[in-house]
Amino acid sequence: MIITIGGLPGTGTTTIAKMIAEKYNLRHVCAGFIFREMAKEMGMDLQEFSKYAEQHKEIDEEIDRRQVEIAKQGNVVLEGRLAAWMLLKNGIKPDLTIWFKAPLEVRAERISKRENIDKDVALKKMIEREASEKKRYKEIYNIDLDDLSIYDLVIDTSKWDVEGVFNIVSSAIDNLKK
């Protein structure tokens, strides 16, 4: 089984992807973890590394290559904004593609709590990072992140608590046509 979960920062992708991986005994692979690790290796914060990646498309290409190779092995929850796009572009049809969304203010609040920073700082960083990513994805892949047509399920995670979102996703998985 191959499941992709994507969404903008602060929508709950990591939380739910971990829970789904555990429940269904799947591996959890997160593009964001790979990206953060690469930023750390280069001694940059996420905003700096995002800007750097705009000029160095090999960063995104390496993340994508790793995701596709892992997906080919199956039994995985791939978490990342481009996970579904990358698999489809490489001829791999996931069993379920999911996109999480939530209002900007809600996401900023979640990020401020998670990273223990001021909400306004979180909002500013989030807006900068998203603008950088949108630009990169359009230039490198010709992907518009606002195009949600490839997703089987789009969930506004501000409408339910974590358990509610988990139940919705679990129900979708349990009811997939065999």
Swiss-Prot record:
The keyword Kinase applies. Its EC number is 2.7.4.25. Belongs to the cytidylate kinase family. Type 2 subfamily. One of its GO terms (molecular function) is CMP kinase activity. HAMAP family: Cytidyl_kinase_type2. This is Cytidylate kinase. GO terms for biological process: pyrimidine nucleotide metabolic process.
